[in-house]
């Protein structure tokens, strides 16, 4: 398991990411029950060079946004206010979700993936219509709260790019991780100055409390305890 140093320098190892991911998913399931749980997707048989350490990523999928509700949603609400989550997607008949022109449903998938080059988590996401057509970034920005768009425009630590998903080989959007190590390091040092180190189990929770806001996903404060 990672040492306190690996948290204080803002980076994670593969094992640390696995530990932090499971802790994040457990806390989310307990404190954010208006959403379906994040699931751990294991990576198997990738290449002969893969180490014996467990690898995988977190997945939260089929979050539904009804775009006609956008004007009615207060800015301090996250995506779950306009969302009916598919908690048991295998039992849901998607044909009943086909919207009218006035009530268009948009679906969102979110993946938290480990970046081996930056040694930090990266948020990948995509939006699509009920028919499967992908949403352009301009449309996605209209779906998320305006405060999320403002946060992205003012951000000095990230920006949105579109590139191939590292495991699905399809184009997804992602929040670039170029500044993640630095601000996580500052956050860790702040915790350290108060007499405590940021434990590995809170790494992803702390990270997502910032990153999630960019895409309109906020976490309950209880998850930070």
Swiss-Prot record:
Name it: Ubiquitin-like-conjugating enzyme ATG10
Question: What transmembrane ranges does the database entry give?
Answer: 200-217
State its location(s): Membrane
The major lineage groups are: Eukaryota, Viridiplantae, Streptophyta, Embryophyta, Tracheophyta
The protein's job, in short, is: E2-like enzyme involved in autophagy. Acts as an E2-like enzyme that catalyzes the conjugation of ATG12 to ATG5. The ATG12-ATG5 conjugates is required for the formation of autophagic vesicles and for the timely progression of senescence and programmed cell death (PCD). Likely serves as an ATG5-recognition molecule. Confers some resistance to nitrogen and carbon starvation. Is also involved in the formation of anthocyanic vacuolar inclusions (AVI).
- Identify its protein family: Belongs to the ATG10 family.
Q: Which UniProt keywords apply?
A: Autophagy, Membrane, Plant defense, Transferase, Transmembrane, Transmembrane helix, Ubl conjugation pathway
> Active site at which residues?
178
């Amino acid at each position: 398991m990672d040492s306190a140093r690996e948290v204080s320098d803002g980076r994670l190892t593969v094992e640390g990411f696995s530990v932090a991911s499971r802790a994040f998913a457990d806390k989310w399931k307990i404190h954010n029950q208006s959403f379906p749980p994040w699931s751990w997707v294991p990576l198997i048989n990738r290449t002969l060079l893969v180490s014996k350490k467990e690898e995988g990523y977190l997945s939260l999928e089929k979050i539904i946004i009804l775009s006609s509700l956008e004007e009615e949603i207060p800015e301090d609400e996250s995506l779950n206010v306009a969302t009916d989550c598919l908690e048991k997607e295998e039992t849901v008949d998607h044909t009943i979700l086909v919207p009218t022109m006035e009530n268009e449903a948009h679906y969102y998938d979110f993946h938290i993936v480990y970046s081996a080059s930056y040694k930090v988590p990266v948020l990948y996401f995509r939006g699509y219509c009920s028919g499967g057509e992908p949403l352009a970034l301009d449309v996605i920005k209209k779906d998320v709260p305006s405060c999320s768009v403002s946060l992205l425009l003012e951000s000095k630590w990230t920006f949105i790019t579109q590139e191939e998903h590292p495991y699905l080989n399809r184009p997804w959007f992602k929040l670039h991780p170029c500044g993640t190590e630095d601000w996580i390091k500052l956050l860790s040092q702040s915790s350290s100055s108060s007499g405590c180190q940021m434990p590995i189990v809170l790494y992803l929770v702390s990270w997502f409390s910032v990153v999630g806001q960019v895409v309109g996903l906020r976490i309950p404060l209880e998850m930070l305890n």
